[in-house]
């Protein structure tokens, strides 16, 4: 299933939300963390107005998430400048994932720091991460990643590298803030470059900050237009 299709499976039920996470979105014995966060964000959009751009998303992975997903979302506080919301993925009444989102309109600032693309890739440049069934994590089949600069994963680098990496999604829907969340978490940890062979690894907490105002990025699980999303780390 495409990400937009999984998001489209999110339906209201018993004061919360439910969705189905298929096997092709697994990361080991749990659902891919980026998908968990994207579903949580989609649920938060049920209680947070779409015109408030996402600023920060903080995720804590408490326990493995499998199969049917149940989500509870609520507003913690709606202030003049920002709105804080919380979403919990639950299983049998127990929290498996906790996500806090901060939303707010932009403000003028005397300190401006615009993110810049430090590398303009050529069409055939860089190393493309292969998807190897049985070896690669299942969710990786939905993303195509090309390393443009920095040491390769498992190359035995002596220090964490500075990566420039291009990520595209196989989704046929328009790029939404939910897609950005998934793409951001699909990027491998920088520490992998310091290893000499594949090894288990998992995140306990994860934070995403939106450095630019993307108020036009609204979750739209039913759209079908072709889009390509890119991310640079």
Predicted features along the sequence, with ranges:
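Terminal targeting signals and extreme-terminal segments of soluble enzymes
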Residues: 1-233
């Amino acid at each position: 299933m495409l990400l937009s299709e999984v998001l489209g499976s999110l339906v209201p039920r018993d004061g919360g939300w439910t969705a189905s996470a298929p096997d092709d979105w697994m990361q080991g014995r749990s659902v891919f963390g980026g998908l968990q966060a994207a579903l949580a964000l989609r649920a938060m959009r049920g209680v947070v107005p779409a015109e408030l751009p996402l600023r920060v998303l903080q995720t804590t992975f408490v326990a493995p998430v499998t199969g049917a997903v149940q989500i509870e979302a609520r507003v913690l506080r709606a202030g003049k400048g920002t709105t804080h919301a919380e979403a919990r993925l639950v299983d049998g009444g127990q929290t498996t994932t906790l996500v806090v989102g901060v939303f707010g309109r932009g403000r003028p600032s005397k300190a401006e720091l615009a993110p810049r693309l430090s590398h303009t890739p050529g069409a055939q440049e860089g190393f493309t991460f292969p998807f190897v069934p049985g070896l690669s994590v299942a969710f990786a089949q939905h993303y195509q990643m090309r390393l443009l600069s920095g040491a390769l994963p498992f190359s035995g680098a002596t220090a964490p590298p500075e990566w420039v990496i291009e990520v595209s999604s196989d989704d046929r829907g328009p790029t939404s803030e939910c897609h950005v969340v998934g793409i951001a978490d699909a990027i491998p940890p920088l520490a992998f470059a310091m290893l000499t062979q594949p090894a288990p690894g998992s995140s306990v907490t994860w934070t995403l900050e939106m450095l630019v105002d993307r108020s036009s990025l609204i979750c739209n699980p039913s759209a079908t237009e072709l889009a390509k999303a890119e991310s640079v780390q």
